[in-house]
Amino acid sequence: DIGTGSGILAIAALKLGAEVAEGVDIDPMCVRTAGENAQRNGVADKFTVLVGDLSDQASGEYNIITANIVAAAILSLAPHVPVLMAPGARFIASGIIDERRDEVLTGLKAAGLTPIEVKEKRGWVCIICKKSDEKEA
């Protein structure tokens, strides 16, 4: 969970059956809050929260990568996402205002991601992507 903030996306994933989750945020206060929220929700043993940004904290491969942050941050981190995606993984970007939809879609494509679904509701956009080089099943 990039820009984990309160940790809500990672905590929800764990509550819905994910085995483990990692969150990263540049704000140490958010990292502390996410850890406290994980403790309150009984998932602290499965949730690792790190201070920093995606490029210096995330490593390995992930099945799902989430980012519920502003468009500018999504565009900035997008080039780092494909290398972190396991085969068949999905990147879910949300927190995008509808005025920035096309700009974010263009940026995700330029970063090596292929949008496979775009959802819009009440002025907000969520974009689900796969890696551009992912083979069709």
Regions found by a protein language model. Give the residues of each.
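A short glycine-rich, Lys/Arg-flanked "PGG" loop and its adjoining helix->strand segment in the class I
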Residues: 75-90
